[in-house]
Amino acid sequence: MSSGNAKIGHRAPQFKATAVMPDGQFKDISLADYKGKYVVFFFYPLDFTFVCPTEIIAFSDRAEEFKKLNCQVIGASVDSHFCHLAWINTPKKQGGLGPMNIPLISDPKRTIAQDYGVLKADEGISFRGLFIIDDKGILRQITINDLPVGRSVDETLRLVQAFQFTDKHGEVCPAGWKPGSDTIKPDVQKSKEYFSKQK
């Protein structure tokens, strides 16, 4: 795995690449296009594989929930945009993706994967990296899975909601926090209000 330039609390590495858009067209997109929005940017190893379609379809199926949070989901792999399109045009029952609600970026030179520190150099593919970038372009969360295990859309959605809550209210979110749950005031005295309610 490459070290990359992606660091929590710093600007997310910029990228510009060709993507297959939800309407099936090719378009060059960049991270800068989504300024003012949260972005969930995830890498997957390869098109036409086994775990990857389950993750991509799960994120695509729930794209509207992210959109309601002013958050854009973007997928990326080292495959060409032509390969992405062929996979999208393959029926789900045959291992394809079917119609997508999110853009899929092509990173054939592996520069984006390298910048984000997810390149598995010996195979020339990406680990399952997931990055939450806030509306100011700051990287707030990084997870990188080894190849065999997929990621949770529910947990990603929860993290976006939690970061947005802390941005807006200045309070911090305890383990397992969900919208509507108690939060903690980041102050020695005021935090006792939260802890006094715990069993």
From Swiss-Prot:
It is found in: Cytoplasm. GO terms for biological process: canonical NF-kappaB signal transduction; cell redox homeostasis; erythrocyte homeostasis; fibroblast proliferation; hydrogen peroxide catabolic process; leukocyte activation; natural killer cell activation; natural killer cell mediated cytotoxicity. There is a cross-link at residue 185 (Glycyl lysine isopeptide (Lys-Gly) (interchain with G-Cter in SUMO1)). It catalyses: a hydroperoxide + [thioredoxin]-dithiol = an alcohol + [thioredoxin]-disulfide + H2O. Residues 176-199 are annotated as: Disordered. The modification N6-acetyllysine is found at residues 7, 16, 27, 35, 136, 197. Its main location: cytoplasm. Residues 184-199 have a biased composition (Basic and acidic residues). Gene3D superfamilies: Glutaredoxin (3.40.30.10). One of its GO terms (cellular component) is nucleus. The modification N6-succinyllysine is found at residue 35. One of its GO terms (molecular function) is thioredoxin peroxidase activity. SUPFAM superfamilies: Thioredoxin-like. The active site is at residue 52. It is an enzyme of class 1 (oxidoreductase). The modification Phosphothreonine is found at residue 90. Residues 6-165 form the Thioredoxin domain. The active site is a conserved redox-active cysteine residue, the peroxidatic cysteine (C(P)), which makes the nucleophilic attack on the peroxide substrate. The peroxide oxidizes the C(P)-SH to cysteine sulfenic acid (C(P)-SOH), which then reacts with another cysteine residue, the resolving cysteine (C(R)), to form a disulfide bridge. The disulfide is subsequently reduced by an appropriate electron donor to complete the catalytic cycle. In this typical 2-Cys peroxiredoxin, C(R) is provided by the other dimeric subunit to form an intersubunit disulfide. Belongs to the peroxiredoxin family. AhpC/Prx1 subfamily. Thiol-specific peroxidase that catalyzes the reduction of hydrogen peroxide and organic hydroperoxides to water and alcohols, respectively. Plays a role in cell protection against oxidative stress by detoxifying peroxides and as sensor of hydrogen peroxide-mediated signaling events. Might participate in the signaling cascades of growth factors and tumor necrosis factor-alpha by regulating the intracellular concentrations of H(2)O(2). Reduces an intramolecular disulfide bond in GDPD5 that gates the ability to GDPD5 to drive postmitotic motor neuron differentiation. This is Peroxiredoxin-1. It comes from Bos taurus (Bovine). The lineage of its organism: Eukaryota, Metazoa, Chordata, Craniata, Vertebrata.
